[in-house]
Amino acid sequence: MYNFSVCLLNSPCQELSYEISGDNAALYIILVGRPGLGKTPPLEAAYRPIRKHDYALFKAYESELETWKAAGESGRKPVLRRTVVSDFTPESLLLTHNSNPRSVVILVDEIMGMFNPANRYTNGQLIEQLLTAWSGGALDVTRVGSTMPVHIEQPCINIVGTTQTKRVHELLTKGFEENGLLDRILFVLPKSREVPKWTDWDDGGEDRASMAAARWEQILGKVLALDYDTGEEERISHVLSMDREAKEYFFSW
């Protein structure tokens, strides 16, 4: 669900979110569990296709940059587009989002480390951005040395990360309960606290796992290939509507 949110924000399939609430479909998710429970591997596996997509964009950017330099740096300088960010400042986050208006995702393994500097070094600027983005409000940032601000009319910022069970309470001591951030976070805990045992792949399980990973990559690839906008001069989100039968099926589910 979270990966689809990352791929679909500000793209055709966000229609249901707008129809219900008028907001985007961003998700803030924290996986909670004791150390060694295996929180990170499934998260990385789920995001592998998106990271692969980002890497392809990076290689294309490298090629375009070399061509631009070879041409005497004439014309518009190429811009790197990416979806996943992990190490960032509030300003760089919005600059990344401006380059990729479809959506960005903050993917942090131990997410408590992200919240600590938010209050100490940026006076809560990051938190304010996240609260505004969640509500669908526009975001602006003025780059250092530039008088032209970056304006994001329809921000779509996702958050996903992990933390240890004993550290969840730290969010309550940082004022996030009062400003409403906690109400926007989905905390996910495992049904079982036992670590799965090693599996013998002699029964063909390895092939099934590879097929599942390939199928997952194919699904996300189709979603990422959807058009973002319909406007030529302005970035206008392209929205598809459900027909009556689809709506009835969804709400019955």
Sequence positions of predicted segments:
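Phosphate-handling catalytic cores of nucleic-acid transaction enzymes
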Residues: M1-W253
